[in-house]
């Protein structure tokens, strides 16, 4: 499986928070207004560019009275934001602290979707970033999205399975992924 077939802008950190901030705004926001979410300008611009390529946001460069970038959700972006807001309300706490806003949460949930359990080693074959995936899985476990079990066999095998709430969140991310890949 190629990375481009599996990863989207939602695979990066803070994408969920950016979409929800745009959804909650009364109208288009200026890129500068979103810097409190992703405080590095270049990272924010790259994230917004990838979201624009996927059809989630529109970016308009305005030159009056000075140059700035206006960001707004597309129709598909509004649909994904609605799905994300439902997922956000299921998990308690601020979006900045939630697993769904962390890097690789989206592909991990989609990988686990529809399976009885997934072995940690199998997750690492798709995403070979051990620290990142263990951090996300730990947060998901704390939030009640996944259950962690260790096998009773002779070797240590860490298994993760989705809880009923985790299955609903995974369905949300699968729906968003389908919208992005099929453009609607």
Q: What are the residue ranges of the model-derived segments?
A:
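Basic, amphipathic "hinge/linker" alpha-helix immediately C-terminal to the N-terminal HTH DNA-binding motif
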Residues: 63-84, 159-173
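General nucleic-acid-binding
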Residues: 36-75
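Beta-hairpin "wing" of winged helix-turn-helix
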Residues: 54-69, 143-161
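Alpha-helical linker/hinge and terminal dimerization helices associated
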Residues: 84-94, 173-184
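Short alpha-helical segments that sit at the start of domains
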Residues: 1-18, 82-108
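Short, locally clustered residues in the helix-turn-helix/winged-helix DNA-binding domain
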Residues: 11, 19-26, 39, 85, ...
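Short amphipathic alpha-helical interaction segments
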Residues: 39-53, 127-143, 148, 157
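Short acidic, hydrophobic short linear motifs in intrinsically disordered regions
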Residues: 26-36, 117-126
